Amino acid sequence: MTLDLQTTIEKAWESRANLSPADASAEVREAVEHTIDALDQGRLRVADKSSGEWIVHQWIKKAVLLSFRLQDNEVMGEAPLTFYDKVQTKFADFGAAAFKAGGYRVVPPAVARRGSFIGRNVVLMPSYVNIGAYVDEGTMVDTWATVGSCAQIGKNVHLSGGVGIGGVLEPLQANPTIIEDNCFIGARSEVVEGVVVEENSVLAMGVFLSQSTKIFDRATGTITYGRVPSGSVVVPGSLPSADGSHSLACAVIVKRVDAQTRAKTSINDLLRA
């Protein structure tokens, strides 16, 4: 079934400029709808980890993009929160039974789009989760945090207030941004452009990470890009230019996570009861 979906999506992608709500074939509509529904239920995800490496399923991302070509804008929601969009909100038709079955908490006015997956014991404070995103169990998405399109958030992650996790749809990115299990992302930090923050890492308040951000390891003196090693404690910093005339922002790995760090950033099970 998945192979058939992929074949249909890939073929439709080649002629995407000609797709519209009026003339798309039933086969393409069904393939895209089935893929979005599978993303919504967590049966499919844009990226998953296999043998220690993240594998990105580009065809699923293409299905998400194609879905925007196949839908007209429509009025949704109720006053005073009325919207006009192509993508329905995830909880539009939910009643008490559906929320209990999902096992998560959604604090008004949090919004998750249909096609995003929310795991059990997740808490969505007034925040935003975009289509294609995967938020695994036990994670806290704090107030005004945003989880971008197709971003992958692991188990027991804390996204602090105002955190931005970048999406892939605009500007178009090859790979999703990934925050692995048991990470703590400090307030107002931004992780974008497919950067991977490996498990058990802590980002301090105001850390900005893109593919071009230098990640300086204080212990080794090495500079890397695009990936924070497992168990790192990262703070914002700067590195001087070769001629000493100026400095540019960077992220600094100051140490590895220890018991003291973990005590300061541990999740509160009382909030997930």
Swiss-Prot record:
GO terms for molecular function: 2,3,4,5-tetrahydropyridine-2,6-dicarboxylate N-succinyltransferase activity; nucleotidyltransferase activity. InterPro entries: DapD_Trfase_Hexpep_rpt_fam, Hexapep, Hexapep_transf_CS, THP_succinylTrfase_dom1, THP_succinylTrfase_N_sf, Trimer_LpxA-like_sf. GO terms for biological process: diaminopimelate biosynthetic process; lysine biosynthetic process via diaminopimelate. Pathway: Amino-acid biosynthesis; L-lysine biosynthesis via DAP pathway; LL-2,6-diaminopimelate from (S)-tetrahydrodipicolinate (succinylase route): step 1/3. It holds the Pfam family Hexapep_2. One of its GO terms (cellular component) is cytoplasm. It is found in: Cytoplasm. Signal peptide: none annotated. Its main location: cytoplasm. Keywords: Acyltransferase, Amino-acid biosynthesis, Cytoplasm, Diaminopimelate biosynthesis, Lysine biosynthesis, Repeat, Transferase. CDD domains: LbH_THP_succinylT. Its EC number is 2.3.1.117. It catalyses: (S)-2,3,4,5-tetrahydrodipicolinate + succinyl-CoA + H2O = (S)-2-succinylamino-6-oxoheptanedioate + CoA. Substrate binds at R105, D142. NCBIfam families: dapD, PRK11830.1. This is 2,3,4,5-tetrahydropyridine-2,6-dicarboxylate N-succinyltransferase. The lineage of its organism: Bacteria, Pseudomonadati, Pseudomonadota, Betaproteobacteria, Burkholderiales.
